[in-house]
Amino acid sequence: MSKTFAEIAEAFLEPEAVRIAKEAVEEYGDHERKIIQIGIHFQVCCMFCDEYLSTNGSDRFVLIEGRKRGTAVSLQNELCKSYDLEPLPFLCDIFDREEKQFVEIGITRKADDSYFQSKFGKLGNSCKIFVFSYDGRLDKNCEGPMEEQKLRIFSFLATAADFLRKENMFNEIFLPDNEETIIEMKKGKTFLELRDESVPLPFQTYEQMKDYCEKFKGNPRELASKVSQMQSNIKLPIKHYEQNKFRQIRLPKGPMAPYTHKFLMEEAWMFTKISDPERSRAGEILIDFFKKGNLSAIRPKDKPLQGKYPIHYKNLWNQIKAAIADRTMVINENDHSEFLGGIGRASKKIPEISLTQDVITTEGLKQSENKLPEPRSFPRWFNAEWMWAIKDSDLTGWVPMAEYPPADNELEDYAEHLNKTMEGVLQGTNCAREMGKCILTVGALMTECRLFPGKIKVVPIYARSKERKSMQEGLPVPSEMDCLFGICVKSKSHLNKDDGMYTIITFEFSIREPNLEKHQKYTVFEAGHTTVRMKKGESVIGREVPLYLYCRTTALSKIKNDWLSKARRCFITTMDTVETICLRESAKAEENLVEKTLNEKQMWIGKKNGELIAQPLREALRVQLVQQFYFCIYNDSQLEGFCNEQKKILMALEGDKKNKSSFGFNPEGLLEKIEECLINNPMCLFMAQRLNELVIEASKRGAKFFKTD
């Protein structure tokens, strides 16, 4: 154990807190710096529950934190049994005897409520959550704590932070939440033996294989002779693409592919309000919108503009308003909610027949034939929505991102500046708006699925953002906005397997009339009017427009939940691609060429009026982000198969650019495999059309492997 950490802990922490922290570090094998973090957390828990009595004179709080794990689990289970509570799947810090509820204490350095949101996403309302920050901020999901408790805790945290800063240990001890502790590993004898056993034949050891790979130099003649030898053993003849050129991909014909994403994008309309840190939970946000924005006045008309089951949707909307009004967010089971939620409508299995009974006929035991999906043609609406996603929205800061760690060298300074530049471009796009909506909404759905699988719950379709004006003026704390796009109803969700499905019914706001070809899956009502702010010169005027309610029943799986709730990963992939290009150019020139590369290096993004369109990397970022996000929301077996097969055509195109020969066994079969994946996925059809355009352009520029017609 490092004497430095131990001495610092003993200088300002109570001896009992230091002892508990040392035991915890040894028990869980944490880094020594955790001594101070654990000690501070334990002392805060003690301050929270010390010297407080219940109405009967006994201790009000039971301290669970600081005990051995086995003892803590036994104590928590005993408390649950004594007070007739459901057992919790996680350990809490404190138990409140007076309110018969567990308490979770958190401590953070962050200036926003992201740490609280992560805790709330895991724990929900199953216990009371209080998150204290070193700068005097308190995030919570309930009333409390007492004023005396807060003052004692904040005073202690301020003293601890000042002491650690004087010792120059604050940044070292409290690492950013996304930074992992470096683990030093040594290659032991067993590891080396296993490594040598895993090398492929004819190599005997890893070092032998490594030496061969480092000295290997390809011999084209030798490789050609080996190919000709193998060709005699293969029945399929090798076909060179110069003689067997690729034709264009045939797109399916038929009705236009409908919109299949779970939430509206371009047509979505949002109501906004200034965010209240004290009321940041999903249910509280929804209550505030209905109370302050008078959204309860939204009443769908009797006859829908299009769609099925209007009576069911209208009645369910009225039940949603009642659930929000009584603040329970729970819808009781009835004919409408059960019908739309798919409760009791699962296909029945063939009943088991006892061995003593005779089977009358085998026809009843046959499974019905699966109907293949109907092929759909390329949707004209997709291009317009793609371009809309690239453009800027009215607000910015849609996707919550982690803080940047301190830079240790000049190259990391370049990278930090580059990432902030790219994030500034991407955070204000319409695509980022939809990503933020997926992250928060699906995250809330995941919480409800885990905590209330047997209930029908109401969840807002919402996102958070920041005002552009405050961001541009450089204000210290930009105004955060809560944006409500609609309401989602989660049906019963017993997700036992990764592919387990559950039904959701969405009610989304819009000021646009439905497109019959695009919105085939929606039932759309007129639902009153709303006021739209429009700029006329330098003044802003309000115009009243019709408000539409788009209703739809769809389903989400456990895997899809995970994809959509982690949509911010699209940022990482996009920014990593451009960052690699910029840092490579800077490393070659041994100077900072980040801005020059962003502004001067061009990237092809599409065609317009028969001509290629290229944009600087700074703007092409938007296209990269939209593509990554669309992969996330439209991903299915069709898209996976298409991307897997199209790589071979792109490899042939790259070989043609480098004037290399390309060949394969069955080029026509490759195209047929690609066309098998083109059924009704809009993203697949869009990418196939883009690939055809790329082939046409390559042929005009002299490509040898593609037909011009």
Curated annotation (Swiss-Prot):
Enzyme Commission number(s) of this protein: 3.1.-.-
Protein modification: Phosphorylated on serines and threonines by host kinases, including human casein kinase II.
One GO CC term on file: host cell cytoplasm
Protein name: Polymerase acidic protein
Family classification: Belongs to the influenza viruses PA family.
Residue ranges of the motif Nuclear localization signal 1 (NLS1): 109-124
MF annotations from Gene Ontology: endonuclease activity; metal ion binding; RNA binding
Lineage: Viruses, Riboviria, Orthornavirae, Negarnaviricota, Polyploviricotina
Cofactor(s) in the UniProt record: Mn(2+)
Pfam families associated with the record: Flu_PA
Described function: Plays an essential role in viral RNA transcription and replication by forming the heterotrimeric polymerase complex together with PB1 and PB2 subunits. The complex transcribes viral mRNAs by using a unique mechanism called cap-snatching. It consists in the hijacking and cleavage of host capped pre-mRNAs. These short capped RNAs are then used as primers for viral mRNAs. The PB2 subunit is responsible for the binding of the 5' cap of cellular pre-mRNAs which are subsequently cleaved after 10-13 nucleotides by the PA subunit that carries the endonuclease activity.
Positions bound to Mn(2+) 2: E65, D93
Motif Nuclear localization signal 2 (NLS2) per record, residues: 166-228
Native organism: Influenza C virus (strain C/Johannesburg/1/1966)
Annotated Mn(2+) 1 binding sites: H41, D93, E104, I105
Metal-binding is among the record's keywords: yes
Cofactor: how bound: Binds 2 manganese ions per subunit.
Enzyme type, top EC level: hydrolase
InterPro entries xref list: INFV_PA (IPR037534), PA/PA-X (IPR001009), PA/PA-X_sf (IPR038372)
Subcellular location as annotated: Host cytoplasm; Host nucleus
Alphabetical GO biological process terms: cap snatching; DNA-templated transcription; symbiont-mediated suppression of host gene expression; symbiont-mediated suppression of host mRNA transcription via inhibition of RNA polymerase II activity; viral RNA genome replication; viral translational frameshifting
Swiss-Prot/TrEMBL keywords: Cap snatching, Endonuclease, Eukaryotic host gene expression shutoff by virus, Eukaryotic host transcription shutoff by virus, Host cytoplasm, Host gene expression shutoff by virus, Host nucleus, Host-virus interaction, Hydrolase, Inhibition of host RNA polymerase II by virus, Manganese, Metal-binding, Nuclease, Phosphoprotein
Self-association and partners: Influenza RNA polymerase is composed of three subunits: PB1, PB2 and PA. Interacts (via C-terminus) with PB1 (via N-terminus).
